[in-house]
């Protein structure tokens, strides 16, 4: 066996040992409570004011993943301008719920001052005095920080919220459950996409005069009545 071959062999063994040591020492990533394969990209979101096309993502979870967080936030939005790829939120509501007890620890309703006011003159005058999108986005970021977001047929709402945050440079880390999708999984009939209609099937009674906030209450009621997750 030649000397040069031995040298190359030793170098190869040392190199292999270094690689294996590096792999063993690599820290494992912490789970955020949602399976990686369920990451759903919300892509091609055209955001105002410059209509830049960006790729943004939210993590879609199963309802069973709710146990990984102490809270969940039920959200609903009112938008103008078409689908979530080019719309703007003009009103928003959410309730934050302690998962183990069902206690509502926070609730929020607000109009949102839009960027394209010239297109919204037909809307209520209260938009002129509404909080800016940045202020509302900061409020959402704080609410979402230790919670999973929930809604009924909620994908477009999630897309609109992410786009709003992007506009004002408030990047939102959203993990969400779509209650409509969860109901469809085990149901052979066509389900109504109106959360009020579905909740009333289970005996829901109106709790708020604000339609968006009442939709949040209806969604939360539906979740508990359907017994998706033991408390």
Which positions does each model-derived feature cover?
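Conserved non-catalytic scaffold segment of RNase H-like nuclease domains
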Residues: 51-55, 59-166, 170, 196-204
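N-terminal accessory regions of nucleic-acid-interacting proteins
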Residues: 3-17, 21-73, 77
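Short alpha-helix plus adjacent loop in nuclease-associated cores
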Residues: 176-197
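Acidic, divalent-metal-coordinating active-site segment for phosphoryl/phosphodiester hydrolysis
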Residues: 211-224
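Active-site metal-coordination segments of metallo-dependent hydrolases
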Residues: 188, 207-214
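The feature marks non-catalytic terminal segments
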Residues: 224-231
């Amino acid at each position: 066996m030649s000397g040069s071959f031995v040298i190359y062999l030793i170098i190869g063994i040392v190199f292999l040992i270094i690689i294996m040591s590096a792999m063993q020492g690599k820290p494992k990533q912490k789970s955020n409570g949602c399976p990686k394969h369920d990451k759903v990209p919300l892509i091609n979101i055209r955001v105002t004011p410059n209509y830049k096309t960006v790729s943004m993502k939210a993590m879609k979870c199963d309802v069973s993943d709710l146990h990984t967080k102490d809270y969940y936030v039920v959200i609903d939005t009112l938008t103008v301008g078409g689908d979530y790829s080019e719309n703007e939120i003009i009103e928003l509501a959410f309730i934050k719920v302690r998962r183990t007890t069902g206690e509502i620890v926070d609730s929020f309703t607000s109009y949102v001052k839009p960027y394209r006011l010239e297109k919204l003159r037909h809307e209520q005058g209260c938009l002129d005095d509404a909080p800016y999108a940045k202020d509302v986005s900061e409020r959402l970021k704080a609410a979402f920080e230790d919670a999973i977001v929930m809604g009924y047929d909620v994908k477009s709402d999630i897309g609109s919220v992410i786009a709003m945050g992007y506009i004002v440079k408030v990047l939102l880390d959203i993990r969400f459950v779509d209650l409509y999708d969860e109901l469809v999984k085990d149901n052979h009939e066509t389900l109504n996409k109106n959360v009020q209609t579905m909740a009333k099937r289970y005996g829901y009674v109106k709790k708020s005069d604000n339609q968006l906030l009442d939709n949040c209450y209806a969604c939360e009621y539906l979740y508990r009545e359907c017994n998706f997750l033991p408390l």
